[in-house]
Amino acid sequence: VLSDKDKTNVKATWSKVGDHASDYVAEALERMFFSFPTTKTYFPHFDLSHGSGQVKGHGKKVGEALTQAVGHLDDLPSALSALSDLHAHKLRVDPVNFKLLSHCLLVTLSSHQPTEFTPEVHASLDKFLSNVSTVLTSKYR
């Protein structure tokens, strides 16, 4: 459960991310594909090379979903219901991959915002991304 302070940290950090969300998520996806090659199996039709338009496009989708989630911190299940259905029933993504992408996104955010990425902010963002992952995998059961 996100505390009020966690929510404040997440909203403040995401407001600083702003228009860079798509780029940061695309960078995190590249980092995930490089660091955890098995994650590539879900994207056999993608050009996964550095700077790929397809990876950037997916980064945009994920970035928009995270922005939507930040705007609905008190009701993530409703805000992400359609994405949860998509990932559970159509795409059948292994739930561990959400954790891997979350980790890579935290690394990416910390590299772009080192001053703002305090241990407290790190913990808040980690909780937020964990909550998003939990919601996205909730319909697997």
UniProtKB/Swiss-Prot annotation:
Family: Belongs to the globin family.
PANTHER family for this protein: HEMOGLOBIN FAMILY MEMBER, HEMOGLOBIN SUBUNIT ALPHA
Stated name of the protein: Hemoglobin subunit alpha
Recorded name of the encoding gene: HBA
Native source organism of the sequence: Elephas maximus
Phosphoserine: residues carrying this PTM: S3, S35, S49, S102, S124, S138
Residue numbers carrying Phosphothreonine: T8, T108, T134, T137
Claim: Hydrolase is one of the keywords in the record: no
Keyword Acetylation: yes
One CC-aspect GO term: blood microparticle
